[in-house]
């Protein structure tokens, strides 16, 4: 198995909808949340604001069932394809990326 580089503590983790490839959210994993994700098959992250682990959907029911886990060429960023149940964003939106800044460059 490929080793993920947790030497800086947290690893950016991009979550994609496995059904259509849409970007759902960006969160951070530490080594513990990564291993909990591997063990349970559901996403676990590290909350920088609360300084604790959190299981996506544990409160809301909007869970993320892991389908695939990828790493980038440096092994310090993760991309996880999931089956998303309900919205991914805490605002109730499907994706956390719904604020367009600029288009038509």
Swiss-Prot record:
InterPro entries: PRA-CH, PRib_AMP_CycHydrolase_dom, PRib_AMP_CycHydrolase_sf. Keywords: Amino-acid biosynthesis, Cytoplasm, Histidine biosynthesis, Hydrolase, Magnesium, Metal-binding, Zinc. Gene3D superfamilies: Phosphoribosyl-AMP cyclohydrolase (3.10.20.810). Its EC number is 3.5.4.19. One of its GO terms (cellular component) is cytoplasm. Its main location: cytoplasm. Pathway: Amino-acid biosynthesis; L-histidine biosynthesis; L-histidine from 5-phospho-alpha-D-ribose 1-diphosphate: step 3/9. Mg(2+) binds at residues 72, 74, 76. HAMAP family: HisI. Belongs to the PRA-CH family. This is Phosphoribosyl-AMP cyclohydrolase. It comes from Listeria monocytogenes serotype 4a (strain HCC23). The lineage of its organism: Bacteria, Bacillati, Bacillota, Bacilli, Bacillales. The gene is hisI.
